[in-house]
């Protein structure tokens, strides 16, 4: 500002042209710094503890022994040609997403219902404790591909092969990354994986497609990340030989912990327990034309076999290492005191979702069946036997629920409606529609055939938002019990609270003998 003012005064002092001075004034501009306005106030998401009142009433609920048996690599279709699944795919590398159905506490029969007012309050369940029981012994399951894309052993290379082989695929098997996971919430968990994105222009054949991070709901039966990445192998690997056959035609998902932690209501993940471990067992490279060629300034080519470089697409085979009972997260109780989100364990819509992954019990059974009656004296032949693979899983789910009540004030109902309007509909609350401004018609003879049919429309059924998804349904509507001391998890919960169960059997006191049957007491003689 100082030099500009000096130039203006200098021009005026030497009788300069007025237009020149006008140009000097046009060159000066005010500051172009951005002005930041305060953000617009938005509605605040509050914790459920601010409008939910907890009672001292607890209930235990447990499932039956849950079993699943199937083929560990792929589903077996029916041989009748109806394309029905005869044997489902059941693998230790799948997500088990249980949808737990709970009874409506507002329709529950309580011995003493004086603790709440049904005209002004509504009841909800809060998850206080959970224990996931796992049966079957510890074991490691393997998978592989009879045509695995393996060119060279890059860890212990015997000789330089190069990329001149037409088909170098081999039969290989691996053991996967070790994962133990348990996620609890009232909505299904959210997963993430890498898939094919949308290119900006025309994409030629053989070009690498753009990648896009996609978020989808984790359903029961989805494959976990086994060590080859969370990606859509069906869309991104056309040769179906880069990974084992159980994931070569599907999607491996990884839980979106960041997205679920950022959920303002925290319904998808109240808390989670996770344990993962992996190390690299072998190092190989893949056959095929390298799409992104190595720059010439990064290497010096040789002669003979080293005239052209071999494939630089290196990859490892994962391994989960040893499994041990010392590092188990299952078969032990977990108590929910404070959730990581705003929902502190409230089971909206009388349901909760329990997601389980356990690769430490992924043993695959080998079942051998003779094709014909064979005797021990006949020579052994491979064609006389058929080999089958099966995998079995065993679960036992136990919960402790706390009864809570919500005071139906105007602010609370408005907040719950903004969070999920279906909750109020489930409580038999509806919004009155505004009066219509149009003139409606009303016929007198509603049964007359001279007018259009006046049959009332049936009420619209409530649509299940998860009706088209796949979950393991577990109905606990008739499994609730107030006698916590009669169950293992209930006794652990009472011990954790420092409470004791009420004694059921009281020792009977002996009745005092009648005065007629008692002998008179002798007076003690005084000593002199």
Curated annotation (Swiss-Prot):
The molecular function GO annotations come to: structural molecule activity
Its keywords, alphabetically, are:
Capsid protein, Disulfide bond, Host nucleus, Host-virus interaction, Late protein, T=7 icosahedral capsid protein, Viral attachment to host cell, Viral penetration into host cytoplasm, Virion, Virus endocytosis by host, Virus entry into host cell
Cell compartment(s), UniProt: Virion; Host nucleus
**Annotated region (Disordered), positions in chain:** 504-528
InterPro entries from the UniProt entry: Capsid_L1_Papillomavir, Capsid_L1_sf_Papillomavir, dsDNA_vir_gr_I_capsid
BP GO annotations: endocytosis involved in viral entry into host cell; virion attachment to host cell
Provide the Gene Ontology terms for cellular component.
host cell nucleus; T=7 icosahedral viral capsid
Q: Compositional bias (Low complexity) at which positions?
A: 508-519
Keyword Aminoacyl-tRNA synthetase assigned = no
SUPFAM superfamilies with a match to the protein in the record: Group I dsDNA viruses
Q: Which domain of life is it from?
A: Viruses
Q: Does the keyword Methyltransferase apply?
A: no
The record's subunit annotation is: Self-assembles into homopentamers. The capsid has an icosahedral symmetry and consists of 72 capsomers, with each capsomer being a pentamer of L1. Interacts with the minor capsid protein L2; this interaction is necessary for viral genome encapsidation. Interacts with protein E2; this interaction enhances E2-dependent replication and transcription activation.
Family listed: Belongs to the papillomaviridae L1 protein family.
Function, please? Forms an icosahedral capsid with a T=7 symmetry and a 50 nm diameter. The capsid is composed of 72 pentamers linked to each other by disulfide bonds and associated with L2 proteins. Binds to heparan sulfate proteoglycans on cell surface of basal layer keratinocytes to provide initial virion attachment. This binding mediates a conformational change in the virus capsid that facilitates efficient infection. The virion enters the host cell via endocytosis. During virus trafficking, L1 protein dissociates from the viral DNA and the genomic DNA is released to the host nucleus.
Q: What is this protein called?
A: Major capsid protein L1
């Amino acid at each position: 500002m100082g030099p500009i003012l000096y130039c203006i005064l200098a021009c005026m002092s030497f009788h300069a042209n007025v237009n020149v001075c006008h140009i000097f004034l046009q060159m000066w501009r005010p500051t172009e710094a951005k002005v930041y306005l305060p953000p617009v106030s938005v509605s605040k998401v509050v914790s459920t503890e601010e409008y939910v009142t907890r009672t001292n009433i607890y209930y235990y609920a447990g499932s039956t022994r849950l079993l699943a048996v199937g083929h560990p690599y792929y589903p077996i279709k029916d041989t009748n040609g109806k394309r029905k699944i005869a044997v489902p795919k059941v693998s230790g590398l799948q997500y088990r997403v249980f949808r737990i159905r709970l009874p409506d506490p507002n329709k529950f029969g309580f011995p003493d219902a004086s603790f709440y007012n049904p005209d002004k309050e509504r009841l909800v369940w809060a998850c206080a404790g959970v224990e996931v029981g796992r049966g079957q012994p510890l074991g490691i399951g393997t998978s592989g591909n009879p045509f695995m894309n393996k060119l060279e052993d890059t860890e212990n290379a015997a000789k330089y092969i190069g990329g001149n082989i037409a088909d170098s695929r081999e039969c290989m098997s691996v053991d996967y990354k070790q994962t133990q996971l348990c996620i609890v919430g009232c909505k299904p968990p959210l997963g993430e994986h890498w898939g094919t994105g949308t290119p900006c222009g025309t994409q030629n054949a053989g070009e690498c497609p753009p990648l896009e991070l996609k978020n989808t709901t984790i359903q029961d039966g989805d494959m976990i990340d086994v060590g080859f990445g969370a990606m859509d192998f069906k869309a991104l690997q056309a040769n179906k030989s880069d990974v084992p056959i159980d994931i070569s035609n599907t999607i491996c998902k990884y839980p979106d912990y960041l997205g679920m932690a950022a959920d303002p209501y925290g319904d998808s993940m109240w808390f989670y327990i996770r344990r993962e471990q992996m190390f690299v067992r072998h190092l190989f490279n893949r056959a095929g034309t390298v799409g992104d060629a190595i720059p010439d300034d990064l290497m010096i080519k040789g002669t003979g076999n080293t005239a052209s470089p071999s494939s630089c697409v290196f990859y490892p085979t994962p391994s989960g290492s040893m499994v041990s009972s010392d590092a188990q997260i299952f078969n032990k109780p977990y108590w929910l005191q404070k959730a990581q989100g705003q929902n502190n364990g409230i089971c909206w819509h009388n349901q909760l979702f329990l997601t389980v992954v356990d690769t430490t019990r992924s043993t695959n059974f080998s079942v051998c069946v003779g094709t014909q009656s064979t005797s021990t004296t006949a020579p052994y032949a491979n064609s006389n036997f058929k080999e089958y693979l099966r995998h079995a899983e065993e679960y036992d789910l136990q919960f402790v629920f706390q009864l809570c009540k919500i005071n139906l004030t105007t602010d609370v109902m408005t907040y719950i409606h903004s969070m999920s309007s279906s909750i109020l509909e489930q409580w038999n609350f509806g919004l009155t529609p505004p009066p219509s401004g149009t003139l409606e018609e009303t016929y007198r003879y509603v049964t007359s055939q001279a007018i259009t049919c006046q049959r009332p429309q049936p009420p619209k059924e409530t649509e299940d938002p998860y009706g088209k998804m796949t979950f393991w349904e577990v109905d606990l509507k008739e499994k609730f019990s107030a006698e916590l001391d009669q169950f293992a998890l209930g006794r652990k919960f009472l011990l954790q609270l420092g409470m004791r169960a009420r004694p059921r059997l009281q020792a009977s006191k002996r009745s005092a003998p009648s005065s007629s049957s008692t002998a008179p007491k002798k007076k003690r003689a005084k000593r002199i």
